[in-house]
C-alpha cells in the first residue's frame, strides 16, 4: 500500500473524508459502549513535539492505546532533533522503528521534509500554517450535531492563522460558504482565498445568518511578543452574545481551545447552550483514531 500522509486538509479527497467520518461514527460508538477494538495491536505511533500541547497529545496517545497500539512521546529538546540532527536523518531513523508518526512543529516546511524522508505515514499535529486534525474534528462535529455541512455558512472571526487556513481548504472540499473577518493587518493571504470564501471587515456582517461561528485565540504560539498589540487590534472581534444573535437561532459555536474568556470569546457564549466546544474537543480523539486506522490499514470493508 502506498504511504499516505496527512499534512494538510486537502491531502484527502471528499470521498476519503466522508469515509473517515463513517469510521469515526463506528469507532466512537464502540468507545461509548466500552467494546474493545484493537485493529492496531502491536503498532507504534511516534509523537514528535516542538510545540507543547494538551489536546493533541492526549487524543493521539489515548487514541493509539484504545486501538491496541502504543505511543511514544518525543520532545525535540530531549532528542537529537534538538541538538542539530537533520530532519531528514531523524525521519529515516524514526520511521524504521515505528508504524506512523505525528509531528507538531512550527514551520510547515519541516513536516514536509520529514514526510519526504519517512517510510511510514506522517500526520500534521499542527504547524504555523495548518491544523488539519482540528478541522477534521470540527467538520465531523458539525455534521454530528446538525447534519450535512454542504451549503451551510461558517463564520470565522479573528486571526487568519493555521486554523483559518485549514477552514479555507475544508470549505472548498465540502462546498460550504466561509465568511472570514479579521482586523486590518491580519487579513488572509490572497493566495489562500478560494471561491467558497468571502472576507468581511465587519465581524457582525460575517456572522450574520451563519450556521456555525468559530474562532481561536488572538495570539497563537510563537507570537507572544505581539500579545498586547493584538489585544488592542482584536478587541472588536470578540464572539459575544450579540454576535451569536446575528447568526442563525440554531447556530453552533466552536473553539479549538485553549480559550481566553473575555478576549476572543465571551464566557456567556463558550459556556452557553450554543457551544459545542467539549464535544468538538472529544471528537479529536475519535476522528484521529479513524485517521490512524485509515493511514495504516486503508479502507476497512
Q: PLM features: residue spans?
A:
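Structural/interface elements that position substrates and couple domains in central-metabolism enzymes
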Residues: 1-301
Amino acid at each position: 500500500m502506498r504511504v499516505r500522509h496527512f499534512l494538510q486538509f486537502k491531502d484527502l479527497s471528499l470521498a476519503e473524508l466522508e469515509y473517515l467520518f463513517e469510521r469515526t461514527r463506528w469507532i466512537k460508538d464502540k468507545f461509548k459502549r466500552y467494546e474493545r477494538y484493537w485493529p492496531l495491536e502491536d503498532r507504534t505511533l511516534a509523537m514528535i513535539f516542538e510545540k507543547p500541547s494538551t489536546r493533541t497529545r492526549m487524543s493521539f496517545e489515548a487514541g493509539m492505546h484504545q486501538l491496541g497500539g502504543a505511543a511514544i512521546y518525543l520532545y525535540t529538546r530531549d532528542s537529537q532533533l534538538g541538538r542539530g540532527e537533520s530532519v531528514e536523518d531523524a525521519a529515516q531513523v524514526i520511521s524504521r522503528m515505528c508504524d506512523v508518526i505525528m509531528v507538531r512543529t512550527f514551520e510547515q516546511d519541516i513536516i514536509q521534509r520529514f514526510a519526504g524522508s519517512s517510510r511510514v505515514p506522517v500526520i500534521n499535529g499542527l504547524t504555523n500554517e495548518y491544523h488539519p486534525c482540528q478541522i477534521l474534528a470540527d467538520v465531523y462535529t458539525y455534521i454530528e450535531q446538525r447534519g450535512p455541512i454542504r451549503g451551510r455558512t461558517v463564520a470565522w472571526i479573528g486571526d487568519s492563522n493555521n486554523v483559518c487556513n485549514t477552514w479555507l481548504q475544508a470549505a472548498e472540499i465540502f462546498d460550504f460558504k466561509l465568511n472570514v473577518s479579521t482586523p486590518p493587518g491580519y487579513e488572509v493571504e490572497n493566495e489562500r482565498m478560494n471561491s467558497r470564501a468571502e472576507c468581511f471587515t465587519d465581524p457582525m456582517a460575517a456572522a450574520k445568518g451563519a450556521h456555525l461561528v468559530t474562532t481561536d485565540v488572538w495570539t497563537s504560539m510563537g507570537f507572544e511578543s505581539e500579545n498586547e498589540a493584538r489585544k488592542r487590534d482584536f478587541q472588536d472581534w470578540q464572539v459575544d452574545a450579540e454576535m451569536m444573535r446575528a447568526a442563525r437561532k440554531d447556530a453552533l459555536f466552536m473553539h479549538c481551545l485553549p480559550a481566553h474568556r473575555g478576549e476572543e470569546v465571551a464566557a456567556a457564549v463558550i459556556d452557553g447552550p450554543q457551544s459545542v466546544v467539549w464535544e468538538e474537543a472529544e471528537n479529536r480523539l475519535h476522528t484521529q483514531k479513524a485517521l490512524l486506522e485509515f493511514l495504516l490499514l486503508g479502507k476497512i470493508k
